[in-house]
Amino acid sequence: MSSKGDLSRCRNIGIMAHIDAGKTTTTERILFYTGKQNRIGEVHEGAASMDWMEQERERGITITSAATTCFWNDCRINIIDTPGHVDFTIEVERSLRVLDGAVAVFDGVAGVEPQSETVWRQADKYDVPRICFVNKMDRIGADFYACVDMIKDRLGAVPLVLQLPIGVDKSFVGVVDLVEMRSITWEEDSLGAKFNYGEIPSDLMEKAQDYRARLIESAVEMNDEAMNLYLDGGEISVPLLKSCIRSGVIGAKFVPVLCGSAFKNKGVQPLLDAVVDFLPSPSDVPTIEGASASDPQKAVTIKSSVDDKFVALAFKVMVDRFVGSLTFIRVYSGKLTGKSVVLNSAKGATESVGRILRMHANNREDISEIQAGDIAALAGLKKTTTGDTLCDQNFPVVLEKMDFPESVMEIAVEPVSTADQEKMGTALSRLVAEDPSLKVCVNSESGQTILKGMGELHLEIIVDRMKREFGVEASVGAPQVAYRETITKSAEIEYVHKKQTGGAGQFAKVNILFEPLPPGSGFEFENKITCGAIPKEYIPGVQSGLELVKETGMIAGFPVIDFKATLFDGAFHEVDSSPLAFELAAKGAFREMANKAGPVLLEPIMRVEIITPDEYMGDVIGDVNSRRGRVAEMQDRHNAKLITAFIPLGKMFGYVKDLRSMSQGRAQYSMYFARYERVPENAVDNVMKK
């Protein structure tokens, strides 16, 4: 931090948005204007420093979240640049989990787009205060005021306008600063490094006065002193106004909205000022709640203090070809020095910290110490995975784990040779450690290795990384939909596993109540055994059996989700019972339940947003209906129609080609996972045949 231990001069922020809204371009300008780098890296040239992977530079998109640190106005800003493509939403999720604030970037032409809504909801989930930056104001069709309306209508947010654009499209030259009531214009020959303050253009003065009055009216509600002064007709000073805005942002009462054009080098410095002035420091964030490692029911409060015991959360693991495994952590309290030993409370094991590294994308800087509020990477950890808590050995605490989305697509991969088989095992173990949304399993019938991920692009990148980084040559099957199964009725099952073949036998009796749960609940296991009907050392065998057997399905071999299993009674034999016997009994109970609990097949439903010229709307809607889709909403959008529909993922293969064909290449779409729904009876047979 700028002054050691001063948490108030630190900001941990993320840059988030829909793909192509300009997140990485904005981040590159931030790094240039703060002096972190002496040149501007352009995404379209494959030269953005934050997009360091080969695949990112080739495709011009961000795939993995990248961290860096810069300074502005004597404040340390730790920045995480996140992906905008829906297939890499896990990178946004785990970044927001450890950030104190965020900058949401919007395309000034497109406004609020599908992934904008997704990342906004993710930020809501973790109560992350944010400010908005309406980018690309130099583009033809950019509409700042329409974008503000969309932030209100589509995101349910309360926008607080702090700037107005000066000029439209190519004539965009700067902004009106409503807090200071002045204009800011940029000098193009300095790449935007130089800017000038001036008078507000006369044609914007009336609008500026109107918006400033609205700004003050909303802001003073955050401070009694300011409210009384306002009601008495007094002048609200700039420092008092900024203090009110800051309180409202931290309290999630509203979101400040600024504008500019990162690519044209306009608007970035005031955005940095807003980050420092309005987003919270680690000391502004409420205390973190954890649980005792020895007693999960006992709550533990962690304060953002350098002087308290060390507590941190591991939010990302990556493999560096030079230093091996790197574990990214956010420190919530205390300090950590190199060569320390810490407790991984999630694993119940100690870890030796080798080096502490400050990261700039994939570049590393050794540092001797980190403390509360810092984000850094640790080298040398062996057992830590994403979501684990690291803490002082004398303060065993567990922070809340992260939730990761269900995979919706899968592919089969087969190594070309025996040598590739060995390399593939190593590659996949490392990639799974890095990416919690990637799942790997082996098909019990075909013996094929199955990769499960968030979409076609996600899996395509994984296969490409196996080849480039690990030298694995593999044949890849066509993408398949990741169907699921669930139950619709409760069923109470009594099952006895008994086997006697001479010598030691096997005996286990279980009574399990199976119940359906709401969508998205996953699997829950509850032990209600009383009076020692089943010894406690056998209970894990029951849970393990259910965890294993639910992956084999009931109808078509797909994993079973959204149900609860309650073990409420049973029996054991002093000699013949064992954990294995109870595991087998649980599996038998599950298979018997499948015939009584109304099993059904589930399919992933995608939210699809299509922008099409009016003349093709009829064809597009007809095509949506033919794919078993449901049109949920239609809106006017810049001489076109925005159609929101929900369509089964299994019906979306090849859609990009079909949409281009029916619209002569003028329509476009984006989609992301919405939920799992029951497959209609008339479509079940088709799924079973696949």
UniProtKB/Swiss-Prot annotation:
Set out the biological process GO terms recorded for this chain's protein. ribosome disassembly
Q: Which GO terms describe its molecular function?
A: GTP binding; GTPase activity; translation elongation factor activity
Carries keyword Protein biosynthesis?
yes
Q: Where does the secretion signal sit in this chain?
A: none
Q: Which residues form the tr-type G domain?
A: 8-283
Swiss-Prot/TrEMBL keywords: Cytoplasm, Elongation factor, GTP-binding, Nucleotide-binding, Protein biosynthesis
Localization recorded for this chain is: Cytoplasm
Query: Gene Ontology terms, cellular component aspect?
Result: cytoplasm
**PROSITE patterns the UniProt entry points to:** G_TR_1 (PS00301), G_TR_2 (PS51722)
Indicate the principal place this protein occupies in or around the cell.
Answer: cytoplasm
Q: In which residues is GTP bound?
A: 17-24, 81-85, 135-138
Q: Which HAMAP family match?
A: EF_G_EF_2_B
Which family is annotated?
Belongs to the TRAFAC class translation factor GTPase superfamily. Classic translation factor GTPase family. EF-G/EF-2 subfamily.
Instruction: Provide the function of this protein.
Output: Catalyzes the GTP-dependent ribosomal translocation step during translation elongation. During this step, the ribosome changes from the pre-translocational (PRE) to the post-translocational (POST) state as the newly formed A-site-bound peptidyl-tRNA and P-site-bound deacylated tRNA move to the P and E sites, respectively. Catalyzes the coordinated movement of the two tRNA molecules, the mRNA and conformational changes in the ribosome.
The protein here is known as: Elongation factor G
This chain's source organism reads: Anaplasma marginale (strain Florida)
Top-down, what is the taxonomic lineage of the species of origin?
A: Bacteria, Pseudomonadati, Pseudomonadota, Alphaproteobacteria, Rickettsiales
